[in-house]
Amino acid sequence: MNSLFVGRPIVKSSYNVYTLPSSICGGHFFKVSNSLSLYDDHRRTRIEIIRNSELIPKHVAIIMDGNRRWAKARGLPVQEGHKFLAPNLKNICNISSKLGIQVITAFAFSTENWNRSSEEVDFLMRLFEEFFEEFMRLGVRVSLIGGKSKLPTKLQQVIELTEEVTKSNEGLHLMMALNYGGQYDMLQATKNIASKVKDGLIKLEDIDYTLFEQELTTKCAKFPKPDLLIRTGGEQRISNFLLWQLAYSELYFTNTLFPDFGEEALMDAIFSFQRRHRRFGGHTY
């Protein structure tokens, strides 16, 4: 489209006809190369292709990185970048439900994030309260993974209420990782198992992969191991996230910062996953 029209409102009428502002075209109707209707068709086609594929990831984990850089690049306080948490995750959950993805795990706050400024941490804790209160009403099941006891008391109460209210919801399961670290998760699982051995509840020879996984915080999910990990923001590392569970996950890194991570970016990640051959340590033939 001509640059004259960039940033100008285009209003859709019936029959895929679009009208440009009267200051540009005198109120006449123009068919804008069907570009907008073609975009809608393309969007629907992508969703159908992905949804009809046998290679739908059951569990997608997301490291939501780049909020601070997004804000700083625009001369804004870092809090402005964090405000995209709820709307973007809501969009991701909505699209994932349509595609048939069953579990989303979002890395929202790590055990190391307490080292940030008290102003930023306090803002995030309030933001998480609002997040859980909002997601309580969305019809998805919501669970926390991570050390809840270190979180502010009010946030703990909101989380507990959200988990109780949504525990019977069918469909998508959203696991929020707050005060979470993969090393922490494995350590607390080890301590729990050691305590059970000490108390005579299990024997040493009973310890295996299955038993260990039952002590990880992700045990609340039907599919606790992610098929796909997405990291936004350009960094190519897993940053102490789901260390045990990611053993055979496909990794997808995108330069897109999380505030800009929308439907098209998520579709790109799913398409990338569907083009891969998962071998789980086996041979390629």
UniProtKB/Swiss-Prot annotation:
User: Gene3D superfamilies in the record, alphabetically?
Assistant: Decaprenyl diphosphate synthase-like
InterPro entries for this protein: UPP_synth-like (IPR001441), UPP_synth-like_CS (IPR018520), UPP_synth-like_sf (IPR036424)
Q: Which top-rank group of organisms is this from? A: Eukaryota
Q: Where is the transit peptide?
A: 1-30
What are the BP-aspect GO terms?
plastid membrane organization; polyprenol biosynthetic process; response to cold
**Keyword set includes Transit peptide:** yes
In terms of Pfam families, this protein maps to: Prenyltransf
Q: What is its EC number?
A: 2.5.1.92
Q: Tell me, in a sentence or two, what this protein's role is.
A: Uses neryl diphosphate to catalyze the cis-prenyl chain elongation and produce the 15 carbon product (2Z,6Z)-farnesyl diphosphate.
Annotated family: Belongs to the UPP synthase family.
Name by which UniProt lists this protein: (2Z,6Z)-farnesyl diphosphate synthase CPT6, chloroplastic
Mind giving the lineage of the organism this protein is from?
Eukaryota, Viridiplantae, Streptophyta, Embryophyta, Tracheophyta
